[in-house]
Amino acid sequence: NPLSYPYEVYKNDKDAAYDLIEDMCKNIYYDKSNDDPFWNNMASSFISGLVASLFTFGKEDEINFNSINALLSHDGKLLKNFVMAKFSSNSYVSTMTMPTISSTSDTRASILSVAREPFCPLVSRKRLSMLLSNSSFSYKDIVSKPTAIFFISKEDDVRVNSLISIFIRQLYM
């Protein structure tokens, strides 16, 4: 579960967790061939805010990509009301989500479309979704004990390669 390590960090150091969340989201939405990074950058910031809101109010077993995908199914008005009711205007969650939530309906729809795109293949495939919903290891154990890790994936599977990159980056942070 790519969110499990940032969530563990969040319990003791919110700022460090926000760095991990932002790094993960930038990795998910990075597209070197994109001439207009605005949409991916906005989607990345928005998802960073949703993840932080999930860390604040979600139960531990809800901290996963399936929950983020479920949050993305809500309309802008519901999300805006939730953020405004639960978070101060200068909170991390508000700072990251309000630019999208408060934008015009066409702009918001475009950002949400970009935000949803990478999650569809991750949550629509049952085995992958289950794999990404929990962690069977501790990052602390991996870095403190001799450990071998094997990744088996298709070379051209950009989404899975992105997840592998996120995993490796989290090990070094």
Placement of each model-derived feature along the sequence:
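P-loop NTPase motor domains
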Residues: N1-M173
